[in-house]
Amino acid sequence: MLPSIVKHATSHKINPLKKHGQNFIFDSSLCDKIIRASNVLENSNVIEIGPGIGGLTRSILQKNPKSLTVIEIDERCIPLLNEIQEYYPNLNIIKQDVLKINLTDLIYDKVTVISNLPYHIGTELVIRLLKEVKLITNMTLMLQKEVVERICAIPSTKAYGRLSVICQILAKVEKCFNVAPTAFYPHPKVYSAIVKIIPLENPPSIALINKVEQITKLVFAGRRKMIKSSLRNLIPNIHEVLTQLKINCNDRAENLTPKDYLRIAMKL
């Protein structure tokens, strides 16, 4: 029988490392709640990024997935994960930095992604997963609360920005619930939140997404400027383009919808 999460981590003398952005979850009931939000189904394929001491890993495995592949950069955690693997042969362990893996080579079938992501790689990894990996059916991620609010923000709100636009033209997004700092060891200085991201079946092309990224980088750098001013150098006939698209030339970056940005990108 596996020891508790706390005893297991203690027996391996694993303390969180700041360089890996580690904040461990010892509460198995919270792990179970996250897995319920993800709606992991029996016989599904799951990838967990950064399993650490294996709290979420255990909760996923209890749902009896067809396979669970965990990607862990911290070699100290590998022996602990190997011990979990002795009880669950459907667990596959990859010791690697997820930012250096070619994820398209790793994923060969439809997969669910679940992760308590380190804050310092969260935004970069979300965008990369959405842009590069076509076989992800859904992602349930723990991120900094502020980042989740930006992902899910609607136009004309303070949180709305580039991240909102890119995520929402590639996926359906939904904030599930907040997680207090006290749920982690060590306690982070900010709240976290769970977000569910369901990639669209027919997303825009990478070329079009790259254009949206180019446009949003310009307009949100001066979000109080009017769109016609922000895009004048990139699109010399911007007034004509916006008029054709029936977008108000005097609108600011935060007023346009993700769909508006896609429509502008199509004119580039």
UniProtKB/Swiss-Prot annotation:
Keywords on record: Cytoplasm, Methyltransferase, RNA-binding, rRNA processing, S-adenosyl-L-methionine, Transferase
Entry keyword S-adenosyl-L-methionine: yes
Physiological role: Specifically dimethylates two adjacent adenosines (A1518 and A1519) in the loop of a conserved hairpin near the 3'-end of 16S rRNA in the 30S particle. May play a critical role in biogenesis of 30S subunits.
Organism lineage string: Bacteria, Pseudomonadati, Pseudomonadota, Alphaproteobacteria, Rickettsiales
Name assigned to this protein: Ribosomal RNA small subunit methyltransferase A
PANTHER family in the cross-refs: DIMETHYLADENOSINE TRANSFERASE (PTHR11727), DIMETHYLADENOSINE TRANSFERASE-RELATED (PTHR11727:SF7)
Classification via InterPro entries: KsgA/Erm (IPR001737), rRNA_Ade_diMease-like_C (IPR023165), rRNA_Ade_Mease_Trfase_CS (IPR020596), rRNA_Ade_methylase_Trfase_N (IPR020598), rRNA_adenine_dimethylase (IPR011530), SAM-dependent_MTases_sf (IPR029063)
An example Gene Ontology CC term for this record: cytoplasm
Residues the entry annotates as binding S-adenosyl-L-methionine: N23, I25, G50, E72, D97, N116
Compartments (UniProt record): Cytoplasm
Matches recorded under PROSITE patterns: RRNA_A_DIMETH, SAM_RNA_A_N6_MT
Reactions listed under catalytic activity: adenosine(1518)/adenosine(1519) in 16S rRNA + 4 S-adenosyl-L-methionine = N(6)-dimethyladenosine(1518)/N(6)-dimethyladenosine(1519) in 16S rRNA + 4 S-adenosyl-L-homocysteine + 4 H(+)
Gene name linked to the record: rsmA
Pfam families found in the cross-reference section: RrnaAD
GO MF terms held by the record: 16S rRNA (adenine(1518)-N(6)/adenine(1519)-N(6))-dimethyltransferase activity; RNA binding
Main location: cytoplasm
Family: Belongs to the class I-like SAM-binding methyltransferase superfamily. rRNA adenine N(6)-methyltransferase family. RsmA subfamily.
Organism expressing this protein natively: Rickettsia prowazekii (strain Madrid E)
Known EC number: 2.1.1.182
